[in-house]
Every structure is written in C-alpha cells, then in structure tokens.
C-alpha cells in the first residue's frame, strides 16, 4: 500500500545535495505521514512512502532514489532489513529508523536513527549522511543517530 506518492519537485534546495530524492519505508501511518511532510518541507523529493517490502522494491527499481529511510518492522513477511539489503545491492544509501537497530545494520546502512526522534533529528541525520557520501567534514551528529564507521 502506498501512503502517498509524490512525483516532481517540491521546494527547490538552496544548494546541490548528495541526497535529493528519498524513499520512506514505514508501516506506522502517522510516522510515515510526518516523515513525508518534514522531508517535503525541507525540500526533498519524496519518491514514495510505502509500508511493505514489495512496494519499496518497486520504487527502488522504477524511480531515482538517493536515500532509503527504512523502519525494521513492515507489513508482510519481509522486513526493512530485506529492503535495506536490496537497496544496498543497488548502491543506495540506507538509514534505519527503529527502536532497535539490527546487529548487522553496518553491513547495509550508513546509520540508524533511534525512535522516537524529532523532525530536526531526522533532517540532521540526512545532513550527516550527505556529508559521509561526499567525504566531507561531518556536522554535529544528532541525538539518537548511530553512524557506522563503514558500510559493507
């Protein structure tokens, strides 16, 4: 099930970013809606907001996505870990958002943001991931973000 699908540009970003398009994979409708709203207001393009593995994979295969923000628990038999493995195999950055980060998360994600989190912490986490992807100096790491030393 798609919670919302946004195609095209939202607000223009002030400067070129490593991350412009985000896929939100979240099974809790209120959290999904909040994430989508916060991301759009910050100028990111939300490729889609989905609640299960199958829809996430469809978006990854058919749309340009720079970052996958994935909860661990999803509707259906597969989890956010399965989504992350697929996304990582396609060369995409993954940020887990979960109360309990998977023990092997460093093998498929850039970081894990602990739930519950504030909107500013989600946006700051994306800023940190952008710095990691560009190889630049890291900004302040927000509360609740565990950044992995390496991926894979």
Where do the language-model regions lie?
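Non-catalytic signal-transmission and effector/linker regions of two-component phosphorelay proteins
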Residues: 1-21, 118-152
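Conserved acidic carboxylate
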Residues: 26
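Charged docking surfaces used in two-component/phosphorelay signaling
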Residues: 33-37, 41
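Acidic, metal-coordinating helix/loop segments flanking the phosphotransfer/catalytic sites
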Residues: 36-37, 49-67, 75
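Conserved phosphotransfer cores of two-component systems
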Residues: 61-63, 86-92
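Conserved phosphotransfer microenvironments
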Residues: 70-88
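A Lys-centered signature of the CheY-like receiver
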Residues: 115
């Amino acid at each position: 099930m798609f919670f919302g699908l946004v195609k095209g540009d939202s607000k223009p970003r002030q400067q070129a970013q490593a991350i412009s398009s985000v896929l939100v994979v979240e099974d809790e409708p209120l959290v999904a809606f909040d994430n989508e709203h916060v991301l759009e207001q910050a100028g990111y393009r939300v490729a889609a907001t989905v609640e299960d593995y199958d829809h996430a994979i469809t978006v990854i295969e058919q749309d340009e996505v720079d970052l996958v923000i994935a909860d661990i628990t999803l509707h259906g038999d597969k989890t956010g870990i399965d989504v992350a493995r697929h996304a990582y195999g396609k060369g995409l950055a993954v940020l887990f958002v979960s109360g309990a980060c998977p023990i092997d998360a460093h093998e498929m994600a850039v970081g894990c943001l602990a739930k519950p989190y504030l909107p500013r912490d989600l946006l700051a986490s994306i800023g940190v991931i952008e710095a990691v992807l560009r190889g630049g100096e890291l900004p302040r790491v927000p509360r609740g973000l565990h950044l992995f030393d390496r991926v894979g």
